[in-house]
């Protein structure tokens, strides 16, 4: 690993830590030439996944788009960044275990939905209201009743 300060290749790892979800490794490094310290983050490279949209279009899977939708659903909720990252990692791990290279958007939505239901019910309702394209208050009331009954189907 080259030093970002002096471009020397003479660096060594001082400390390594696995993330909570074991999907990445954070390494603290020291440059032997200029004595600068810097941190690197090693993450699992996902296989290329295509998303099949409702209208039949295909687009490459965008991890940032998924993270943004989860962040919007959990906005101003008592959910930490660590919890959000854990949910994201679970979802990405699930994608890695799928044999297909094309995943329907519907399947992605269901996986996110199920993870948010466990994490925070309000975030779940927010996500589902967009995902299911709710049109009026009755849709919300119906979903809340299903959650109270313990069934989200």
From Swiss-Prot:
InterPro entries, per database record: ATP-cone_dom (IPR005144), NrdR-like_N (IPR055173), RNR_NrdR-like (IPR003796)
UniProt cofactor(s): Zn(2+)
Family, as annotated: Belongs to the NrdR family.
Region feature (Disordered): 1-20
Protein keywords: ATP-binding, DNA-binding, Metal-binding, Nucleotide-binding, Repressor, Transcription, Transcription regulation, Zinc, Zinc-finger
HAMAP family named among the record's database cross-references: NrdR
Compositionally biased residues, Basic and acidic residues: 11-20
Domain ATP-cone positions: 49-139
Name by which UniProt lists this protein: Transcriptional repressor NrdR
A GO MF term: ATP binding
Positions of unnamed zinc fingers: 3-34
Pfam families per UniProt: ATP-cone (PF03477), Zn_ribbon_NrdR (PF22811)
